[in-house]
Amino acid sequence: MQGGEPVSTMKVSESEGKLEGQATAVTPNKNSSCGGGISSSSSSRGGSAKGWQYSDHMENVYGYLMKYTNLVTGWQYRFFVLNNEAGLLEYFVNEQSRNQKPRGTLQLAGAVISPSDEDSHTFTVNAASGEQYKLRATDAKERQHWVSRLQICTQHHTEAIGKNNPPLKSRSFSLASSSNSPISQRRPSQNAISFFNVGHSKLQSLSKRTNLPPDHLVEVREMMSHAEGQQRDLIRRIECLPTSGHLSSLDQDLLMLKATSMATMNCLNDCFHILQLQHASHQKGSLPSGTTIEWLEPKISLSNHYKNGADQPFATDQSKPVAVPEEQPVAESGLLAREPEEINADDEIEDTCDHKEDDLGAVEEQRSVILHLLSQLKLGMDLTRVVLPTFILEKRSLLEMYADFMSHPDLFIAITNGATAEDRMIRFVEYYLTSFHEGRKGAIAKKPYNPIIGETFHCSWKMPKSEVASSVFSSSSTQGVTNHAPLSGESLTQVGSDCYTVRFVAEQVSHHPPVSGFYAECTERKMCVNAHVWTKSKFLGMSIGVTMVGEGILSLLEHGEEYTFSLPCAYARSILTVPWVELGGKVSVNCAKTGYSASITFHTKPFYGGKLHRVTAEVKHNITNTVVCRVQGEWNSVLEFTYSNGETKYVDLTKLAVTKKRVRPLEKQDPFESRRLWKNVTDSLRESEIDKATEHKHTLEERQRTEERHRTETGTPWKTKYFIKEGDGWVYHKPLWKIIPTTQPAE
């Protein structure tokens, strides 16, 4: 291993056990590039670190951390090794003694990893045996790296206890001897389940019974339900406190108490589940045929009572829900027509709504809500069914966000104006990369509404033909392209019009999983795009990742070409401090007919250095393996296009004109169209009335759940309105390629 640069002297206060200086600690990784070198000497420690990219794979991590020993000795550097295969956290006096017996070992199965709320460097590892390591990293980023790796390893081995391990013999220890003996403190627990029997004679007697009654876990369930009720009362009393004063609901100790109590209940639920699995493995061979096993869940689910970090006001008799006149009653909404409806374009007017969004900034005021939410989540957990707090919402639906990706219709229409297959692929990449800054509103750290199943959104754009012909995005090979000759099949109205029309429709076709379908077309230019997207969200520790599963197909019927493309992932970072959003991942664009393809990479910011929102791309002719265009820059700022002829073009997205979409007034929209459906939520958010917005949002979600239960009970399948399922995807019911025949131009 190579040494790094020397760093500043470190000073440790023995009386207080606090780090007063700063040193560099590195956690290299054997299996990835996320590593660094470590060197040590008697006087200083140095290191070099590369940017860590988050991964949810299990990795062996090792490096120096500071370990708090006691008030006399204080903090000391120790060399730590995370052994994922064995599920152990080991430490040594230094790196040179790594081949010797470890100085200490913690079993991670059943452990709890807790970042400190006092500073951004410290964290604790609490083993199921009761032993605790208090550790300190060099900075917040290094701490997050260690915490993430430890949590992944802990979750893996905790789940393995119930799934893979056979029941072990219970062992009981003397609490007095185990707590006072240094040897017993250092000895790792052989299995996390053994700790659950410490000092509990009642459980010991139960373990000796050979034939347990089928309902022996009912008492445990009742005790857990009672504990959950007390925990809910605790949180309710804390949140009833004023937000300011001597004792407030935002007091740091109370916030930590809330988060810790919720985490404790989650751990107990995990333990209860393990007991059920163990009991099932005992009874599996002796059950008569046809017998079914039902899990004994607590009577009241915590998640049902704390959707947004507190009890919902409408759940009590003391509070009256706000009237929602525009929202459709349950009985009536279930009878809405599901047949496709033709939208009258004459009813559409230019959008006048103010869509300006303020960034979240620091979230100190909502810290209690976020801490409560985080206490319910596990690393890698699917967030599809998790209700996120209302204050992070944009004032638009996800379906409208997809429409906003079309806010440059001039660039979209200009794709088919390309004189060659190469030019058309480059134009598509130019359009694709310029669509995100408006679709994502720059990089605002908010999320759109999750669409209700059956929700739709309609709009259109009018684009003067002269602006498309003189588009500044035309490359040098197409500068002379003018308005095309009338296409066969175009109506006299379309030929005589000075504007192209791009029409857009989107529909939420599925609720679980959440899948949206959207379709846009320009009939005059014989082009359309059809896409389906499944938004799959995941909890990543201090960030949330959203994978856009699915694909889109752009059809240029005039040229007989199809361009298949995918979408990048989105990440919400620093959700506890100042949230921000970035895009990440590799996407591809392919045209099978012409042999041209594009590879686009949205780069996530590394922990150390690097730029935000960076994107690079290459357009290649696969047959000759020739790169015809390269792109670099930021997807929400400036893009640089370099063409094969040496020409370079810069596009400042902040100055790029946005064409306003045309929508029908609310009174002419159907009850399930996005803006009318979410009107009360949007109005409340505009007035900064978060509680009222939460109530309206809950009403919509409850209606959706009620209708879903009704369909399940009656065996009625959901019928989509505008999209038809074909294979694994969804296709618009009247795509342009079924109406207008594809032209096969001469090569």
Swiss-Prot record:
Changing residue 171 to W: Found in a neurodegenerative disorder with demyelinating leukodystrophy; uncertain significance. It catalyses: a 1,2-diacyl-sn-glycero-3-phospho-(1D-myo-inositol 4-phosphate)(out) + a 1,2-diacyl-sn-glycero-3-phospho-L-serine(in) = a 1,2-diacyl-sn-glycero-3-phospho-(1D-myo-inositol 4-phosphate)(in) + a 1,2-diacyl-sn-glycero-3-phospho-L-serine(out). This is Oxysterol-binding protein-related protein 11. Disulfide bonds: none annotated. It comes from Homo sapiens (Human). The lineage of its organism: Eukaryota, Metazoa, Chordata, Craniata, Vertebrata. Residues 170-184 have a biased composition (Low complexity). The modification Phosphothreonine is found at residue 27. Heterodimer with OSBPL9. Residues 689-713 have a biased composition (Basic and acidic residues).
